[in-house]
Regions:
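Hydrophobic positions on the alpha1 helix immediately C-terminal to the Walker A/P-loop
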Residues: 37
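Active-site signature of alpha/beta-hydrolase-fold catalytic machinery across serine-
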Residues: 40
Length: 141
């Protein structure tokens, strides 16, 4: 089921507030504005953000420090406290730590650091942006 993309970040905020999920995943290509959107949502919703870039060990293929990532996410969720996780291939990272997002935001657009082949395969497998709860066309303040 393809969901209609939202046009403004305040509309996204309203929809998230209505659902108030525990785990929000923000996905999209590199350099598209995921971190900026995550920071804005964290500020608006009063919840922390876990940036996958901080847990990277390799770019080709992308790999994370999964034990550390799991610990960071689990500490919030085990206490029933919300958390935002953002980054390229975020759904794969969450799979590796046995977590599922309650709410997925996909930031659409063209990325920048040469992960194109891996991203195309990932988007096909994950059916993004169509399977996301919401899809933005880039994020700009």
């Amino acid at each position: 089921m393809v969901k209609a993309p939202i046009q403004r970040s305040d509309e996204l905020l309203d929809r998230i507030e209505a659902r108030r999920p525990l785990l929000i995943a923000i996905d999209g290509a590199d350099g598209i504005g995921k971190s900026s959107l995550a920071s804005w949502l964290a500020w608006q919703l009063g919840m922390p953000t876990v940036h996958l870039d901080l847990f990277l060990t390799s770019l080709h293929p992308i790999q994370w420090l999964t034990a550390d990532l799991k610990r960071a996410v689990d500490r919030r969720l085990d206490l029933k406290r919300p958390v935002i996780v953002e980054g390229v291939l975020v759904l794969d990272a969450l799979d590796q730590i046995c977590r599922k997002a309650d709410f997925v935001v996909y930031v659409a657009g063209v990325g920048g650091i040469g992960l194109a082949e891996q991203l195309v395969e990932y988007q096909d497998v994950r059916s993004l942006p169509g399977s996301a709860d919401f899809s933005l066309d880039g994020y700009r303040d």
